[in-house]
Amino acid sequence: NCITLQEAHRFQNTIIQRDGMKCWDWDYLEHEIYKGLAKACQDTGDEKIESVCCSSWSQDFGLLNNAGELFYKPVSYRDGRTQGLPYNFSKTITTQDLFKRNGSAISPITSLCQLYSMAQNEPGYLHRAGKLLFIADLVNYNLCGEAITDWTFATASQMINIRTGEWDVELADKMGIPSKILPRVNKTPQVIGRIDRPGIHPKLKDVPVVSGAGHDTAVASLTVFNDQEKIAFLSLGTWAMLGCYDKEINLSRIDDHSISILGLPWGRWGLFCSSVGLWLIQECVRKWEQNGIHTSYNELAKRAADSRINSIIAVNDERFFSPVDMTKEIVNYCKETGQVIPGEPADFAKVIFDSLAKEFGILIEKLEKISGVRFEKIQVVSGGSRNKYLCSKISEFVGIPVITGPAEATSIGNIILQARVMNVLKDEEETGEVIKNSFSFIDAFES
């Protein structure tokens, strides 16, 4: 048995300004999703569509009113409304107590911080809301009408009590967040309904909708060689999530609040360190395109190897989170720290890739300390696994071999989860064999 991927549709996801905030263009996203589903129906010809399942980034959400209508469309975590959080609500709860409750890294982008900001500045929207749904949940809801979230999203939101496994209603009340808006949590991947949407492609009518693969990083972990405990995995896309499987929750051993304990499908847990990822180079490319300089990520990766610049930036510095011009911020950082200033795109690429690799070296040390595991390899998945230069630098800075692939880890993990739910795959052992039979893994980057 093996999996064959065929891309039906691909589109850009961009941030727009709405009411003075950085928001996702939800109407555009919906339009493109349904276009993609229609194309998939056409591409499969007479073959039956067995199921549909959605994965997305975590944290961001929309609000439904009591009539079930989306009245508050998703705002991006890159909006400045959570600036200073969670430290600014320390009078309500300290960061130490917060971590003890949910085991999530202290970060301003979490759903909790966004909702706290709304409670302070937009309370009317929260009182009007009937249910909160995360991005992939909204897609599922639009397809089948079921307002349900899944375990992977809930544990990432900073609102699940890690000891009880339920929504932390006491915490929500402290923050001024109405607990009535928190949806039912689906802890086991399963069919939650069938597609029943006006105007949908006829082939999709009554097709099962599967929930359980919400958080993209969590579902990407299904593509990792999890039969080998001494392999760490790095999901490297816009964000970078470096993690490993964790057999039990033990908050007492974690003294670093940049570590998160996140739920994975089928009740598993993972220890994760998060970092900015390819966002830095993505924003540089966007700025170059605006200025008429056209390049590709593959070309930048190749040319970075020929650049002689050795400057290093602190990739998680706040200045790089949502700048107007990423290239200017990198130049200014190098000036301020007395380093060589990048000039050509290849120089910027080398600075970014080297700096990311150095950061991952720091994070792997943290992960080894907390997990008690000395990792023998790192498996890099998602888009960054295609970047040979970056993967070689990761191996160099981390000091252990790097395995790369699959590049489309989230899509593949999503398909694997559906296949398990629909009884196409029996268990984890069969899943592992199918992954190994289906995809090429490069084990060529050694420190």
Q: Predicted regions span which residues?
A:
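Active-site core segments that coordinate phosphate-bearing ligands/cofactors
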Residues: 90-102, 113-146, 159-161, 165-166, ...
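Structured loop/turn residues at beta-strand edges in well-structured enzyme cores
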Residues: 3, 47, 180, 229, ...
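Short alpha-helix plus adjacent loop in nuclease-associated cores
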Residues: 75-94
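Glycine-rich beta-strand-to-loop/alpha-helix junction loops that act as flexible
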Residues: 55-58, 188-190, 236-239, 377-385
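A conserved helix-loop-beta module that forms one wall/lid of the active-site cleft
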Residues: 175-190, 415
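N-terminal glycine/serine-rich phosphate-binding loop of ATP-dependent small-molecule kinases
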Residues: 1-72, 100, 128, 200-210, ...
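Short beta-strand-loop/turn "lid" adjacent to the catalytic site in phosphate-handling enzymes
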Residues: 18, 41-77, 105-109, 136, ...
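Short glycine-rich phosphate-binding loop at a beta-alpha junction
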Residues: 46-56, 131, 184, 370-382
